[in-house]
Amino acid sequence: MEQKWVVFYVSSHGFRHMTRSLALIEEIMKQTSYHVYLVSGAYQNEFARNYLKKFADRMQYKDLKTDIGLVTVQNGLTVDVEETEHQLIPFVASWENIVAEEVVQLKDMSIKCVLTDITPIGALVGERLKVQTIGLSNFTWVEQYEFFHIQQEIIEAFKEAYSHLDLFGEYALALSMESVNCPRKSIGFLSRELDWSKISDLKQQYGHSLFISCGKAVKIDRVHIENYHGTVFTTSGITVTGSDQIIELATDTQDTHNYLAASDLVIAKAGWGTISEAITASKKLVLIERESVLEDTHNIQQLKEDHLAISIKESELAALDIPRLETRADRDISLERLNQYSNQQDKVVELLGLK
């Protein structure tokens, strides 16, 4: 029987594009007989190979820089607009050669569709192969770069690439994405499946805990917590002080979402992946404001309006009074509303017509 492939291009910017894509790939593996050709950065693919190792016989990987995203200043959350633009110019110029190489590699494969989250390379490859091409995201780089007044030629190149999408799977908290003119399907929140046995073990072993993350794309000099005696789980890139029970999760930890779900309070950059993991696990969420980032500001505004999160300024990380934060979270976050949301992982394959 001929192998049928789903080709998936995932942004190499940060890590949460990959983690939510892994949730979808898991379901493709469980619900269909498709093989998956996964293209992303070397760092992201290394994580994916380990996470999906039980499906190794149906996976093929290619390491490739698929996005620039937003470049941040050293040891901070602020976007370096000049450096972002500096890196985008040669990246856009490289698309033609990258797409040509991908088409040569894929042209003899039987392909069901091309998925992209949300690198323009996937949209361009799908168009060249003349197969259905589906975008998946809560934003595109068009509105992100417009917000920062990136060169118009760069923005037009992204618009042109996205114009080849046949369908767009829109995650929760989506920006308006006016440049997307294909049909859309609403997906909601999507995250990797939780291991409730592991979560129970973590709670028993560590007791009360916090989860602090700023994502793998940025580094923060220091976070200082005050008046807290529980365990603090942190991801790489953060130096946390103020507690003698700090556990830094290794960069290759496969299930940070289980540690998040075992925690009483989640303090994080307002990226979509961590938000989705927290919301679907019904966790009280404290988001770090980055007024310079359109997506983060939009996410925080929506979640606060819906009583699903509270926010703090980046400057407050120097002295986080945890009892005060917990009081604010208890006052302003509605557990009733939080419990209305669920992980759409098992529904997305059918929703996108892959089954």
What is the role of each PLM region?
Residues 144-217:
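A nucleotide-sugar donor-handling region in carbohydrate enzymes
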Residues 30, 34-92, 315:
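Conserved nucleotide-sugar phosphate-binding/catalytic loop shared by glycosyltransferases and other
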Residues 25-26, 190-265:
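Donor-nucleotide binding loops and adjacent catalytic segments primarily
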Residues 322-328, 337-355:
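C-terminal alpha-helical cap of glycosyltransferases
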Residues 18-28, 44:
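Short amphipathic alpha-helix
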Residues 2-14:
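Nucleotide-activated donor-dependent transferases that construct or modify glycoconjugates
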Residues 114-117, 258-298:
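A donor-sugar binding/catalytic signature common to diverse glycosyltransferases
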Residues 101-159:
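Conserved nucleotide-sugar donor-interacting segment of glycosyltransferase catalytic cores
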